Amino acid sequence: MATAICVFMYADANDTIRTGRIDEVVVTAERSRKTNIFETIPVQSLSGNDIRQLGLQNIADAVKRMAGTNVKDYGGIGGMKTVSVRNLGAQHTAVSYDGITVSNTQAGQIDIGRFSLDNVGMLSMAIGQGSDIMQTARHYASAALLAIETERPVLDKGDSRLRLALKGGSWGQLNPSVRWWCQAGENTMTTLDADYMRADGRYPFVLRNGKEKSNEKRNNSDIEQWHGEANVLHKFGDGGSLDTKAYFYHSQRGVPGSVVLYNDNSKERLWDENFFLQTAYKRHIARQWKLAIRAKYTHSWNKYEDTNAKYANGKKTEVNRQDEYYTSATLGWKPTSWLEMALAEDVAVNKLRTTVNGSPNPLRTTSLTALVSKAKYGRMTIEGNIVMTYATESLTESEKYAIKKPEDRKKLSPSLSFSYRLLPDEALYVRAMTKSTFRLPTFNDLYYLQIGNTSLRPENAHEYGAGMTWNSRPIGPLRNVALTIDAYYNDVTDKIVAFPSTYIWKMVNFGKAEIKGIDATMGTEVDIAKGYSIVANGSLTWQEAKDKTEGSATYGSQLPYTPKVSGGLSVMLLTPWVNVGYSATGQGKRYSMAQNTREYQLDGYMEHSLSLSRDFLLGDNMLRLQLTVNNITDKQYEIIKYYPMPGRSVTASATLDI
């Protein structure tokens, strides 16, 4: 039926044309895993097929397997999940969805747990910015970029694909989804995605207090969420393209509290809604020139509610609304075969309306201008850019609450990176980079209740790195081996932190951090027999992140939630009968506070998962059945202190491609 609708849409526009017909071949393509060994900056990628074979449950699970990343996970299926790269902080990491950045000016960090993995075609993490010279100025301004690209199959004219999936698992998890792709014309594709997920999240854990222990169940960890999006992708005859996306997300969840002294009773609730409409137009406007124009409108709404006798009416309620109007234009110029240049200009207007008493309802206008150049001559590639940031704010209720308007902020942020191929006939590269970035204070940093401080300066970060990459040639059954190793040094100054004053906490610029580390990755593919192959990937990070604040009582201590050693491993065995995926992630010991004492120490852990899947051909349709066991050893651990993570869980899924 889906194909018939798609054919009708195509035929209606061309019903006067009579042509002969030859047999056509349907080609479905998925963006394959990239080694990225030739990039001047570290880039790690996971294809959608890798993600599905491993049975990963969410974006955070995938990101944990990338070197240099630190995911804060507050536990449970609905717990908030944020990512920091090389310990610069979640506010320095940009998240893009099909090429355009996702924003949250109020809090400054993105909950990556809200994004579905089911329609991901490629997930990549870049240190610095992405590799596309035509990207937005926001990408160039970020210290790291997590890019989510949705799946786009290649179809014949008038053809369509329908994917129905049902997933269920432990703790009441139920997750149906539907995806539809339609090649409505020779140059136009439409797609629809919808999914629903719910879970009660009442997973068991062992509560320990000294020598005593008891078996408990997690409370207030339920979630119910809906997600839908529609895309229209069109290619023009002049080589241009126009991609338009409408996206909607709604969730209601419990906010699981910390488990302290046998008390994990939490009655906090959170409702989230997010809608955005984005469009991107790209084309070559002359032989040497190309243009990319992007625009986006975002509306975010969230409601926080806490029921507790300590409040005057027994309940506390906060409602926040954010609106963003965003536009971006990038003009690229390639005067010679070895030189490319680009000029990117972004303008964003962000507005916050909140019921929190004392908020001045701020409006921020930000301009980002990036001048970019990339030269490739012989075996050397050099990339450089400089970003100019200008931000100004106005306050609707400044006089009412006697809040001073922050000063306008201006900043130049340069970046330089290069790579050099050491041998002309061997894929062996060395690379180095330096990058300066900064983050503006969030609306919460500036205005939230009494802790906000409108005198805050931007937080500055400087990145330095050097490394080596190698990709082998095929050797017998060994398709390839890809290795990367990068050493880095980062320093962060004017850190924005909450600092105790005489009566209350206050946001201030106080502190300096120095981060030293080494990231290493490995990937290989081996054909072990006809129809049998192994794909293996691993990552390892060693990191020292020290407090270097002069006069601080914790000077020289490892920063909170920063393990010195962390890593991940995944192995896929592909056979004609069943595909087996194994993955493991782990972290060494770390501390929940700046005081590196046993009282605040979190023990290291390793989590192992196993997935079995098989594809069945049913006529012209494909059915995939998959069974995944997460945390096979039922290891109990915490990523955030007093927030226990789930133990062993089982997920079963069926996916039908029509």
Predicted regions and their residues:
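Extracytoplasmic beta-strand/coil segments of soluble accessory domains associated
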Residues: 60, 64-101
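Flexible loop and strand-edge segments within Gram-negative outer membrane beta-barrel domains
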Residues: 201-205, 215-225, 233-291, 297-324, ...
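Structural signature of Gram-negative outer-membrane beta-barrels, strongest in the C-terminal barrel
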Residues: 336-346, 350, 354-490, 570
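Short, acidic, small-residue-rich periplasmic hinge/interaction motif at the N-terminus
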Residues: 12-52, 60, 125
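A beta-strand signature from Gram-negative outer-membrane beta-barrel systems
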Residues: 117-163
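Gram-negative outer-membrane beta-barrel transporters
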Residues: 482-491, 509-592, 633
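Membrane-embedded beta-barrel scaffold of Gram-negative outer-membrane proteins
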Residues: 288-306, 429-433, 459-516, 521-523, ...
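Transmembrane beta-barrel wall of Gram-negative outer-membrane proteins
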Residues: 168-198, 209-252, 273-290, 336-339, ...
